[in-house]
Amino acid sequence: MFIPVITSFLTVCFNLVIGSTLIIVPLRLKEAGAGIFAITGTLSVWAVVCAVCAWLIGQILTERNARRLVQTGTALYFLCFLGLLLVPGIRMQYFWLLLLGIATAVYCAPFQVFLKTLENGKQAGLVRASALYSASWSFGMAVGPFLFSMLSAGENGMAWKTAYCINAALMIPIFFLPVLAEKLATRSNRTSTPEPPAPADDFSNKPDLALWGWLLTVAAFAAVATTKSLLPEQGPDAGYSETQVSLMVSLIYFGHSFTSLCLVRSKEWMYKASGVTAGTLCGIAGLLLFVFGFGNVFCLYAGSVLIGIFSGVVGFCLVFYSLAHPEKAGKYVAINEITVGSTNTLSPLLIGGGLVWLTGWNGMPYLALSVLAAVIGLLYLKRMIQIKKS
């Protein structure tokens, strides 16, 4: 009973600290007068460092050292937040961002392996696992900016210090909780009789739609990454406060998380055009609100939620499509990580900063992303119609 609570707490917390830091750093750079590429590049730098270090960690990762690596990542997180508090100079922000990327990789890469060592062979259904995985990390990413938005509303420019103090304090229980979870799991395994595994969901006879999961991910996650990186740069220029900008980012991930939770009891919609088409239309509508409604804060709040719904539907499909055919799951999951990582790395710079720099129009990235989502959505719809006819 306590193990799922502990692991859920760990999942939410490490995404909370990432989410808050990735909104605080660009906002502080904007306040210091940094250029658009320096601001939008924060997410790209973090993603690149995280991806490279995750690959390196994968070379030494085993079930035996997974817990120690998770604790090492926690210690690196603590050092990062301590550094952001004690050496907070603007020129040091990218250095601490590099350390955050390393800490994220050292923590997250072994985390799933560590959870597997606690399960003792128990498995959730594919649909449930896909939905809950997508919901848990996005909820943590939502809570981080949300807490910072609340702190920003009540403090005079020092909310970032309070946020980093909270992040550092969270690392203390997080460091020891994996040991507690491991001991509880060992005790449970000794005293309980293993239950026969529940029948697994079998979708292996369904069409292989992994390619469409990756294409949709490019559209949806590019929308999230670009919007998230541009808001700290464009929001203050439009007169929005740190509180409002942070809340917009938070609403994207809340939309993603609650959409994922709504999909826990999914049956067959993943193989029908209507679900993804509806999600894509939400994304297009949300992006267009950023194009034509940037002067109205409520339009941006609504647009953020709609973009979150789009990424929630696609995030579920990404995980589900890659695991629906077990014989290909290993390769597909690896491609998932490459797709998400490269999208998070390239889109803020190329679509975000790049298109604004080339055109001089702040709305151009959102318009381009809405066109990309429409094209991929139409191609997906065409493919699903072909499958239905065959």
Language-model features: where?
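C-terminal membrane-cytosol helix-exit motif in multi-pass small-molecule transporters
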Residues: 168-191, 377-384
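Intracellular juxtamembrane helix-capping segments at the cytosolic ends
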Residues: 106-120, 312-327
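A late C-terminal transmembrane helix in Major Facilitator Superfamily
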Residues: 328-358
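Cytoplasmic helix-loop-helix junction between adjacent transmembrane helices
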Residues: 98-136
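Helix-to-loop junctions at the C-terminal end of transmembrane segments
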Residues: 53-66, 152, 259-272, 355-356
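Central cavity-lining transmembrane alpha-helices of secondary-active solute carriers
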Residues: 41-59, 250-262
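Helix-loop boundary and gating motifs at the non-cytosolic
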Residues: 1-47, 210-216, 221-238, 245-246, ...
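Structural signature of the two symmetry-related core transmembrane helices
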Residues: 68-83, 274-289
